[in-house]
Every structure is written in structure tokens, then in C-alpha cells.
Amino acid sequence: MMYKKQNLPELTLRGLVLGSILTIIFTASNVYLGLKVGLTFSSSIPAVVISMAVLSLFKTSNILENNMVQTQASAAGTLSSVIFVIPGLFMCGYWSEFPLWQTFMICLCGGGLGVLFTIPLRRTMVVESKLAYPEGRAAAEILKVANKDQSSKKGKQGIKEIALGSFIAAIFSLLSNGFKLAASESNFAFIWNKMAFGFSMGYSLALLGAGYLVGLAGAIALFVGMFLAWGIFTPYLSNFEFDSAKNAVDLASSVWSSKVRLIGTGAIAIAALWTLIELLKPVIEGIKEIVKNVKITNQEKNERTNIDLSLKSIFILFVLMVVGLFITFYSFVEDANLSIYYQMLFSFVGTLVSVLIGFFVAAACGYMAGLVGSSSSPISGIGLIGVIISSIVFLVLGVELFQDPMLSKFAVALAIFTTSVILATAAISNDNLQDLKTGHLVGATPWKQQVALLVGCVFGTLAIVPVLNLLYQAYGFVGAMPREGMDASSALAAPQANLMSTIAQGIFHHNIEWGYMAFGVFVGILMIIIDKILRRTQKMSLPPLAVGIGIYLPPAVNIPLVIGGILKYIVMQHLTKKYAKNSHKEEKLASCEQRGTLFASGLIVGESIFGVIIAGITVFSVSMGGSENPLALNLANFHDSELFALIFFVGVVLYFIKRIVKKDA
């Protein structure tokens, strides 16, 4: 850790102000993109770059202050994930307008609990584990390089690698997401013997960089999951859904989204549960470590990098969050005009389910973020698990009560409402451990980072609520329009919320296809067994969570990750042979690996920053009554966007290899 023994200013007023502004901007952009296409981007890395640029204007700025800004701003990309659930309250027909303070409290209390739940996990998952945490490491590398002596050869070279990767990714992002000259993905499918085989190739350079940081084990597991989904499950199941009126792409996509994705959810659920079982002992040890640190803090004042928020502070904040949740649940339940007994019962159980599941999900999400990165961690899959558990709990409690159609609608809404709290907790946990990893690598003070995370939750929440309401009033959601006569074609899809609403309604109306979920659990158990065998006999691994993720995520997301992981393995194997007889072998390999890490980090930076810029331009254009694609060139004679994207992507891969292999270390 670079600055472990230095006491530099970390939580500063200017840093908090800058972090708050970035949080609001990134959150607004993420809410729009998430509702439109079901995706959000991590704001940590662009926050690092912007923070360095702004704070460099002050002579007294330092690496730890920059780290606090990105820690605070990271709440934007993750807390906005609640949009994967909340629109479901409109889609099931329960809400017709946003109760602003209820939505505010969901985000604030859920996000706050996510921060608190990661505290006992920090030492276990961040300090002592070997998890990759790709975005966390990337942010740390950027901070380190930017704070090195700029006159040194290595410092200048590091900045060059980041800048070059950023520039390339930014150009492609502009061509793809802005000008619409390059496709973001290509879809292929064919039908053989009434079975649909599908495949999609994504061209995201940020995911290519993230795959490089994830490495080979995660890449292979993702590929296995993807092969199971699109090489076996989808073709087999499509045989029973065959419709000659549908083309191959539509048939394969519909089968995957409606059935195979449920298999992935089942696999993720059992893999996450197994992860929790394996982590139970170290988590308990982590909690004991906090108690130990509280007792000896006065004896170890110099060990600031080991100090979390005090147990007293955690307890007070926890109680405040739980009380706030109970009041919010009571307000929600009160609208259903139930007896006081059921009002208190559902309020208490909703709060209890949110807190208990939230804690266990926090551990699982932290592990997933370390394994495949926050950008690829299937938060919506966690949401599906949450909505299923919540629905079953409430169904058991009010099985007779919910025979009434109106109360059945309330039950669906209550399950979705509870899931939104769980998802807010999970989303923050998913990214917070990335931030704490960054802090650990640069020597930040944990308790100060945890304060910055809580501040980020507050300002992220302040942005989410009004933006969410504004977009709903302007466009509506698919199947839930705020006014009659609106153009349904412009409605925001909110795909994850639609799926969760469907599942909740299916449970209460007894028409969900549980068989696919159960089969997914079987697949997950099989992967756990294979992983255990490989670890014991071959010194290899096949992370079962990553296999489930490979089934759940579309190939357009998986493929760049897989390519990045394989690319790193091939390059490092080549370099190991190249420097086998070199007396400075380890130094040479470390230098090459760092160069690759920095270039990969640059790819993530460039695409992330331009994602923010283009999202901001889009939101501004739409709010002014303009186009949803204000930068699109709309060239009538240009029909080769997919070929152009493929050539660009392959060119970047080849250039990536050249930067690492052929350049003198």
C-alpha cells in the first residue's frame, strides 16, 4: 500500500462537494440508460479521472483525496440499480404515480444498509482474499500512475498506456453509441431440425478490458455457462416452441429470455448460497475482528488502514436504517386498508426480510464483484432471487387474505417493494468492496471511505427520485403509461422490472414455471462439484457463480469478457517463454503485466466517460423535446455498421497484444 504510513488529508470539503456533484450527474445518466436498455455503467473509474483533473488545480490535493471522491461517486452507478425493480410497481398496476418520499427511503435505507453490511466483509474479502476486483484494481492503478513522478520514464509510460486505451475506447464509444456508425453487437441465429441456435457478438472495449483484468478462470467459466445456454438449453427448448412464423433470432431470443434465463437464475441462486455457506466462518471472523479493533484502537492509532467505523457508529446507523425502513413499509402497507394486525405484521416481516436477505446478498454480491467485476455482476439476478423469496414469504403469511383479487395485487406490489430494498442493499455492496479494494491498494483509511460511501448514498438518492419521476411522466413504462393518448412506442422498457413483476404475479397466481429454476439449481450443484474436483486434482477452478452468470447474461456481454481473459493468458504464457532464460524474468513479466493492466484500465475509462457524456447529451436532448439519438448521423447509404464494429474490435485486440508483447519493458 502506497501511503499507509502517511497521514494525508482524505475527507475534505472540496472533495465532498465534487463527489456529490459527480454522484448526481452519474446517477441521472444511469437511471435513463437503465430504464431504456436495462444496463448501467460503473461510475468509479470515470470519477477517478475527473477527480484527478479537477483536484490537480489545487496544490494540496493528493491520491487519497482523489480516492475519496471516486468512492463517494461510485454510489451513482450502483444505487441507480433500484430502477431494475421499482418500475414493476407500475407494471403490476399498483402505483400510478411516484410516492417520492417512499422511493427516497427505499434508496437511502437500502443503500445505507449495503454500506454497513460490507464493513465486516472488508478484511475477509478485500484484504485477505485473492479475488480480482477488476474495477477496483483498475482505479487503483490509475491513481498510482497519476501520482507518480511525472518526470520518470515509468510514470510517463503508465499515463501514456491509460490515455491511449481511453482514447481508443472513447472513439469507438462515440462511433457506436453516439454517431451510430458502428454496431454495439451483432446477432446470428439459424434453425436446424426445428431447433434454434443463436449467438451474439458484443464489441464493448470496456468489457474487453474488464475480461483482461478478470483472467482465465473467470473467462472459461463464463464460456461454459454461455455454451450451456446457447449451445444446449436454447436449442433443446426451442424445439418445443418452434413457430415457422418466427425467424431464428426472435425464436432463440424469446426462448432464452423466458426460459433459459430462469435456469441461469437457479444456478446463480445455489452458487450464491454455496458461497455464503463457505464464507460463513470468515464472515464471523470478520465481525470478531471489528470488535477486536474497537478494543485495541487506542493501542494502534498508527494503523489507520485497519480501522473501520466503530461498532457503536455501525449500531446507531443500523438502528436508524431499520426504523426508517419499518416506517416506510408501514406507510406502504397502510394504503391497502388492512386491519391493524396485518399492517403491523406485513410491515415487520417486510423489514425483517429486507434486512436478513440484504445481509446475505451483500456477501454474495461482494464475492461476485470480486470474481467478475461490478460491471458484469448480475444484480438483476439477485433481484429475481429476492422477489421469489419475498413473494413466497408473503404468500404463506396471507394465503387466505390474498384470494381477493385487489389484495392479490397488493401482495405482488409488497413483494416488489421489499425486493427494491434488497436490491438497493445488494447493488451498493456489489460496488463498495471494489472501492474498498482501491482504498486498500493505495493506503486509504477504511472508516473514512465508509463515510464517503454513506454520503454518496444520500446524494445518489436525491438524484434518483426526481429523475425517475420525470422520465416516467415524460415517457411512461411499457404497459404502464401515466396518461392516456401517449405514444407507447416511446415508453421505457425497464426489462428487469418487467421480468420481476411477471415472476411476482406468477407466484401469487400460481402460474410460474418452477421447473426451469429447479433445473438451474441442479446445474449449479453440478458446477460446484466440478469446481471442487478441479481445485483438488488439477489446481484449477471453474467458479460456479461465473457459470451461472454465463447462462444468465447475453453472449454480447460474455464474449468480450471471455476474449479479454483468454487474451491475458495467451500473452502472459508467451512472455513467460520469451523471458524464461532472462535474469530479470520476474521484473520483465511484472512490467508487461502492469502495462496490460493499465491499457485495459484505459479501455474501461474511455468507454465509461463517453457513456456518461453521451447519456447526458441524450437526456438533455429528450428533455428539450429533441431526438433520443441526438448525435446519430443517419447516413442512408451506410449499411455496414456490424462489419465496421467487428474490424475495429479485432484491430484493438491485435493492437492490445502488440502493446504488451512487442514494446520493450
Predicted regions and their residues:
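Alpha-helical multipass membrane-protein architecture
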Residues: 1-665
